[in-house]
Amino acid sequence: MNIIFMGTPAYARTILDALVRAGIGVAGVFTQPDKPVGRKQILTPSEVKIYAQQNLPHAKIFQPKTLKEGTVAAEILALKPDFIVVAAYGKILPKSVLDIAPCINLHASILPKYRGASPIQAALLNGEKNTGVTAMLMDEGLDTGDMLGFTHVSCEGKRSAEMFEILGELAGELAVKTLFDFKNLTPQKQDDALATHCKKIQKSDGLVNLSEDAEQIYNKFRAFHEWPGVFLESGLKFLELNLAEGSGAAGEILRIEKDGFVVACGTGALKILALQEAGKKALDAKAYINGKRLVAGNKIS
């Protein structure tokens, strides 16, 4: 079996590794162009490119700005793939590519729920108890293709980084199973009436207000823990928090405990364990409280 793999982040790298370990031949790898990262804007390759360079010496690596470039379809065709496997690639596949071989996407939700760019974060943001991965035959729509298989998993109490790892492993297993069983699978249409969508995450999505429900803020924290984090309009960022018991005026410090402090929200309360003011170093909650000389009854803003 000979495939082309298209993907970019660690989630995709995990899937690619599962395919390689299963003995599936990878003729080519498509990934996003290297991007400037950090304050020094150092040009950095994707996780998938790093993996391919280290483990796939015979695979061609492609980093086109768009798959609509004139030579892309011809280059793919020349590699004679049996399948094109796609996972969090971040680019639209045009019809000229979709027509070359069956294109199978490993989407990190149970479709038709959470079509779009951020399905893992969306599941956590909405307080879902379970999520999963769908293997799907790609078409020209956004995550609208016929489904080939599913894997379900609990996401209760988990954060985005943990779910990316868990779902990457499950997606790798599902990808291998789907390719080897492909001829025996019956594609299943999605019910568009049940479809929900999720968007690309922006930094502004991490903005919270303590007048919100505590559970809503907690779910934002779980979803955006990796990036962009959760922060108040003042720039104060919550680095570690949990749900807590208590009620009071939004932003009021209800009590100070050994390892943190409890603050009231619009409904419910949160225990803050670590935080960071804009432009300053991260602090544990106790150091922050002592430095600001805050006591129960004071407000956080």
UniProtKB/Swiss-Prot annotation:
| EC number assigned by the record | 2.1.2.9
Q: Which major enzyme category is it? A: transferase
Cite the entry's keywords alphabetically. Answer: Protein biosynthesis, Transferase
Q: Which Pfam families match?
A: Formyl_trans_C, Formyl_trans_N
Cellular compartments per GO CC: cytosol
Give the signal sequence positions: none
Asked if the Swiss-Prot or TrEMBL record annotates the protein with the keyword Transferase, the reply is yes
Reaction catalysis annotation: L-methionyl-tRNA(fMet) + (6R)-10-formyltetrahydrofolate = N-formyl-L-methionyl-tRNA(fMet) + (6S)-5,6,7,8-tetrahydrofolate + H(+)
Q: Which residues bind (6S)-5,6,7,8-tetrahydrofolate?
A: S109, I110, L111, P112
- What molecular function terms (GO) are annotated for this protein? methionyl-tRNA formyltransferase activity
Keyword Transferase in the entry? The reply is yes
> Function of this protein?
Attaches a formyl group to the free amino group of methionyl-tRNA(fMet). The formyl group appears to play a dual role in the initiator identity of N-formylmethionyl-tRNA by promoting its recognition by IF2 and preventing the misappropriation of this tRNA by the elongation apparatus.
The similarity annotation says:
Belongs to the Fmt family.
Q: Which NCBIfam families match?
A: fmt
Which protein are we looking at? Answer: Methionyl-tRNA formyltransferase
